[in-house]
């Protein structure tokens, strides 16, 4: 299943170098998707998601010293003891949302903006909440530099959602509470989907939440995962 991601032998990396690494990342995501096809219910992710992953320059959304490793399929350290998610998990979470070009999306946990950029490629508008001010500022700068004008970021605790812009077609959460915050379910439109990691630190699951036309809510565990805890949502 493993597809090796070549790293440069030395010297300054160029855009063509990053492009080659990005294509290797895409191949590894495809291989891992096939490997967990039973859990995902599919062996191939939506081509629109894969195209977005192939387009967005992940090296522009990681710390400068980690750029050579931007396309390795692994989480990377970010600011303030946070991490940027593994590309495979980014792709799976995005695919589970089944985004449409007309969708408005609520993202909890902007980080440095990589997942936000993927969402912005596929949806009409992204409303993203980041609790750490410096990370929110950096994300705004990075997203603006790459022309993403369909994103609004606010600084705050994402557990309460963003009522002023609710309801949302889709919700994605990039840090894990022990339980799904009720406001995020309330702010999901009928027919909407939410993807969220949840559970105790050593027992987290990636969960797909669906709300039907009558507001009935169902959940499905997808994969075991390990995420940073959602701020102000520690266990207990």
UniProtKB/Swiss-Prot annotation:
It comes from Polaromonas sp. (strain JS666 / ATCC BAA-500). The keyword Hydrolase does not apply. The gene is pcm1. Keywords: Cytoplasm, Methyltransferase, S-adenosyl-L-methionine, Transferase. Its EC number is 2.1.1.77. Its main location: cytoplasm. One of its GO terms (biological process) is protein repair. One of its GO terms (molecular function) is protein-L-isoaspartate (D-aspartate) O-methyltransferase activity. It is found in: Cytoplasm. InterPro entries: PCMT, SAM-dependent_MTases_sf. Signal peptide: none annotated. The lineage of its organism: Bacteria, Pseudomonadati, Pseudomonadota, Betaproteobacteria, Burkholderiales. Belongs to the methyltransferase superfamily. L-isoaspartyl/D-aspartyl protein methyltransferase family. Catalyzes the methyl esterification of L-isoaspartyl residues in peptides and proteins that result from spontaneous decomposition of normal L-aspartyl and L-asparaginyl residues. It plays a role in the repair and/or degradation of damaged proteins. PANTHER family: PROTEIN-L-ISOASPARTATE O-METHYLTRANSFERASE, PROTEIN-L-ISOASPARTATE(D-ASPARTATE) O-METHYLTRANSFERASE. The keyword Methyltransferase applies. It catalyses: [protein]-L-isoaspartate + S-adenosyl-L-methionine = [protein]-L-isoaspartate alpha-methyl ester + S-adenosyl-L-homocysteine. The active site is at 85. Pfam families: PCMT (PF01135). NCBIfam families: pimt, PRK00312.1. GO terms for cellular component: cytoplasm. This is Protein-L-isoaspartate O-methyltransferase 1. HAMAP family: PIMT.
